[in-house]
Amino acid sequence: MAAPDAMTSLVKSSVALLSSAHESLPTSLAAMKTAETAPSSTFGILGRVILSILSVLPTLLFWVSYTLPTWLFTLFSMSLTFTMNFTTLMLVLVFVVSTISYFVRYRYLTMYARLPPEPQREEPQVEVFPESQEGDSKRGLSNYLDEFLSAIKVFGYLERPVFHELTRTMQTRRLAAGETILLEEEKGFCLVVDGLVQIFVKSNREESDSDEDDGELQGESGGGSAQAHRQGYQLLTEVKNGAPMSSLFSILSLFTEDVKLRHDEDSGPSSSTPMSPQHRPSMTRNSSFNMDDSRPETPIEAQEATIRRRRTSALASPTAGGRLSNVPPLSLDTDGFNDNFKHSKQRRSPSRSTKPKSAHPDIVARATVDTTIAIIPATAFRRLTRIYPKATAHIVQVILTRLQRVTLATSHAYLSLTNEVLRTEKLMNKYTTYDLPGFLRDAPLERLKEKFTKETERLGSDEGMKGIALHNPGAGRRRRTSVSIRSSTAAQARLAAARGTSIGSNVEAISRLTSPEQGMRNDRISAGDLLTNTQMSRGTGRSGRSSFSQPYQHDVRRDARTPLDASGFNPFASPSMRPNLHRQESIDEATVFRESVLGCMFKAIGLTSPENPVPRPAASVEQSPRLVSFDAKRQKAIFTSAFGFMDPYEASRDGDADSVASASNLSTLSASGNGNLLEEVVNDVEIVFFPKDAVLVEQGERNPGLYYVIDGFLDVSVAVEEDSSESNVLGTLPTGPAVTEDDLFGPPLQPTATNTSLRNGENSKKKRSRKSLFMTRPGGLAGYLGTVSSNRSFVDVTAKTDVYVGFLPRASIERIVERYPVVLLTMAKRLTTLLPRLIQHIDFALEWVQVNAGQVIYNQGEESDAIYIVLNGRLRAIKDAENGKVTVIGEYGQGDSVGELEVLTETARPGSLHAIRDTELAKFPKTLFNSLALEHPGITIKISKIIASRMRALVDDPLHEQSKERSNKATRTNVSSTVNLRTVAILPVTAGIPVVDFASRLMNALNQIGVPRGVVSLNQAAILNHLGRHAFNRMGKLKLSQYLADLEEKYGMVLYVADTPVKSPWTQTCISQADCILLVGLAESSPNIGEYERFLLTTKTTARKELVLLHAERYCPSGLTRKWLRNWPWINGSHHHMQMSFRATAEPVHQTGRRLGNAIKQRVQVIQAEIQKYTSKRVRQTPLYSADTPFKGDFHRLARRLCGKSVGLVLGGGGARGISQIGIIRALEEAGIPIDIVGGTSIGSFIGALYAWDADVVPMYGRAKKFSGRMGSMWRFALDLTYPSASYTTGHEFNRGIFKTFGNSQIEDFWLEFYCNTTNISKSRSEIHTSGYVWRYVRASMSLAGLLPPLCDNGSMLLDGGYIDNLTVAHMKSLGADVIFAIDVGSLDEDTPQAFGDSLSGFWATFNRWNPFSTHANPPTLSEIQSRLAYVSSIDALERAKNTPGCRYMRPPIDPYGTLDFAKFEEIYEVGYKYGKGFLAQLREQGVLPVTEETEKEKNLRRTMAPRRASI
């Protein structure tokens, strides 16, 4: 028992121990938990997870290995039997099939119906931000100054010292209402500061100048005094605030009073030359104000001088009382005025022979209200001429340019006063004819002709017509750079000036060379053959060239006027002659000819030789011209001649003039230093031979240079169009070839030129007859006016016989004009002398107007009082509709005219006219027209022709017919929006876009396309290089605007590249000067508004804005363009997709740290790129099928769009017959004809959309063939049949076929611009679709009524567009397309005569259809009648399309094929391809194709810019 007890006690003790341990366990665990909380909890959770997995795992294994197999065995061992009849089975089967068909048909296959809605983009409204105009009356000092500054803008840019010098002696006068002044007596520049002045001219005056001999041009300007009071006066114009009362002629006369008309070596000073200083001792302080005039004082002048000396503000009145009564409108029969006027005429009659010609002949001014005028006296202009000669030349250049562009061009092209304008060309010959020396007339000339004859025989007649130039060994040794010349000769020029060296000594050598004595020396030298002595001069530099002055150094020393001249340093002599004065070298005859021709040219343009020097003042005065004595009381400078300080060969030695008035010009003109002028220019002279009938200068082009006739005769003529009925004088409507506006402003950038060449063969080359004006004999100069003034020629210059001429390029003339202002002043003097008085009166009334961007010129409903001609800039005419919307009537660019119809019919303005940008206008007042019409009825006839031609254009214009009764937005808002664009701004969306590279490529494309007069690209660097660092400050803004206006007039198109930060002045200038703004963005970047767009919106510009999206690859993802256009509602032009390789981001900066991580990341990116090559969709960068032509690029497409030379493709509807259009497009591609815009109707919209998508033939062919296969399946058509309530089919299969072709692509994403038309039967009109999902509007355009149901779009039902217009040529023309290829594949109309009587039996009609012996035509069926009714309006539109200018109508022979013959795809395709090849070959034979190479012929017109160098 002991053992069990012991065992029991042991158990009890163990239990007690375990219980105590159990009781102490929580405390120990708690302690451990507090010690190691985190690790114990983590391991505890992990342990529990492991234990639970181990506990569940056996259960799971048992279920999988035993339970599941048992259940499956039991299930598959069971037997289940269902019993049902056939009806139940069929119902179940039908239910299942229907359910599946429903989900497949209406859920899966109708994805096209569940696309997110993308409605058509609304056309943006016309932006109008007019400036508030307060009328003509302004008050306040600031407005007073504004009026004065606006009046003197006619002088162009005036620097501050020049402005102060011009206005320091200005006088302000006050005219009472009705007070009259004789502008003929006013010596100065008059302008109206406040008030209104009427200008009158004698109306009954006999224009005797036109009947007199040419030598009598400087006759006196009025009738006798007895007839003065019987002369009626005609209102010429009204001068308002800020307008000058003086004309451009009067300004030129003030500057050129002391300039000689002709410089003869053997003649003394002419009557126009002022007295020398020693003959004018009486010029003292007691001299009156007008003492410098070469005529005695009249009582009126004495009275005026007295009043001026007393400094009164009242104007001298012709009457004793100082005030006149009101002058009647057409006569000035006031007694007091007539008596005084008669008395003054009698007093002045003895001195009439010495009276200079007045700048204001027969002009009277009358103040309508109390008026304030300002007068800048003539002395201010003389002093300005002396102190700032280059500034004077600049002003004269500006005035001459405006005189030509405003007065002469308007008179010539607009008023039909061609004879009056061209008289100047003829009469100028007597001032510019200088014969060559006699020793060059015989043997040397014969040897010259012999060499040219041999070369002509070798080259042939075609090459010879371009001109053959004599080999010029010195042509390669042109002038040094401007920097080196300026640095090396600036000090030399001042040293020569200090020593009194005459620059005119250069001509001295020429004069001796052309003397008979020198001719004998030349005979002794025996020049021999033309290249006898050129081998020695070819290999040497400039110093080694045989100078024309070297063989005659003894004569130079002998003829020197002073020892200082002989021994002094001459900076203008050649470097080779200075160290060795006795070097003798022979001269070849070519050099003698060039130097002689150059000497005669210099005399003709006004550069005198020192035998008859212009009188010079004392040397002391010359050294300090700013210290000229000036009498402040008499406001009279005590000096002699207006050119006393400016020798004709003096290149502006005045330091102040150089630094102030010409510093910026010298920094940009190449080779403008003061080197030896003859040495520099003689190498530019070419001896050129032109055969008979060769054209040297064409009417309307810039003169290549000066032509000096050595032998032969030149015919100066004007071209006359034989058929000018289609011409539109100033080019506002592109209806025909503009002829006279080419002479006015050069060829316009509009679709008129190409239209002429792309019409019928007989119309493409119109015969132009020439009206001969005069002949230029040997010794005469051709191209003088146009070359010196840098304007276009009014005349044609052709070779009447075989002619040998000396040619000096325009660039050399421009250098001479810039350095020697007397050349311009001489031409201005001759112009003011020769132009008839009628032109002067027109110049007086024509007003040069400068308006700011957004400024309103006239408002809708105002009285029409003037015609406006655009000199540069752009205008937009708008009309406010009754519903509050603004519509564009038209836009007018350079050379266009506005307002003739309203002025002639005396009706109110039909709309408002405002300036899109800063614009210069010529204002032609109605009063001037009325005045001229009385004496020159031809003016009325000319204007009537203009109005009649415009009315005819409106009647014949298909666009006008289309928009007259329909409200087609696309046709109406884009009227003339791309016509005659002259300035284009390239603006980036945000920083970092390569606009400079873009502009460079665009400019190259524009040059290849062929813009008339060329293209120039401007960026900030170019402007700063030309105008200096002050180009954008307040002082340089006027100078900058004038420079930009000159560039716009000189070039056909100006590109402004905004390559500066956002708010820089240059960016603002680019925006303000643009006719069209191209916003360039990267397609893959964010479409959010960039900083440049925000700045653009703040400028409130109304210019046309177009979006350009640059793609790295030739692919545009669907919906990308819509994202851009959705955020940019102000894009009122089109958008362009262009491929351009660029670097989107800059090179990343490599970090120095974590090199291993960067290397791994870079390696991963490389691997991903390699994988994407094989997994992603590859996008081709070039078209699969492309002809070898450079004109199909994206930049050429944009260039043609900007120039108005776009090529459009219009595809008509006709069902399966439209497959032939694919073959014709392939033929166009192979011919190298680019397509820029695509439009289509019905099947044409489908084919056109396929081509516009990628601009590629191969994918278009594949997709079209796939679609034809679907349409050719009769099973698909049968399965789509439905109950014919609205149509025979549901349209689902048709929708599926189109959607599978285009997917969710949108029209905006197409690479080419595309549109399609539909017929809106809800609103009974045609609609044009240019945005939205492609498949919807292509489907709508193909919806044949009855076969397909209409497509619902925004509540409207759309059907086939061919019901109204099956060939949308009119809309394509409105988009700016110049050449249009229209392909018509519609069915022919059945026009067989019918005679079935007044009633018709259906049984008889059916029997007659099957009766082969019937003689009656088959009557139309009901469906045929409905079809003919539907296409009634389309037939009329088709006939108008065929007659549209520039349209090439094509109809392939596809009549045997039906509308649904899609199964004959290959056959129809081959028919179209063969027809296209034959049609284009025919056009090529007619000389019409290629379209893009027409500019090569135009380049050859400038034959003498780069004459052929024949190594004779």
Curated annotation (Swiss-Prot):
Documented EC number(s): 3.1.1.5
Biased composition (Low complexity): 537-549
Residue spans of biased composition, Acidic residues class: 208-217
Matches recorded under CDD domains: CAP_ED (cd00038)
One term of GO molecular function: lysophospholipase activity
Active-site residues, record numbering mapped to chain: S1242, D1360
Composition bias, Basic residues: 343-358
Function as written in the Swiss-Prot or TrEMBL entry: Intracellular phospholipase B that catalyzes the double deacylation of phosphatidylcholine (PC) to glycerophosphocholine (GroPCho). Plays an important role in membrane lipid homeostasis. Responsible for the rapid PC turnover in response to inositol, elevated temperatures, or when choline is present in the growth medium.
Protein name: Lysophospholipase NTE1
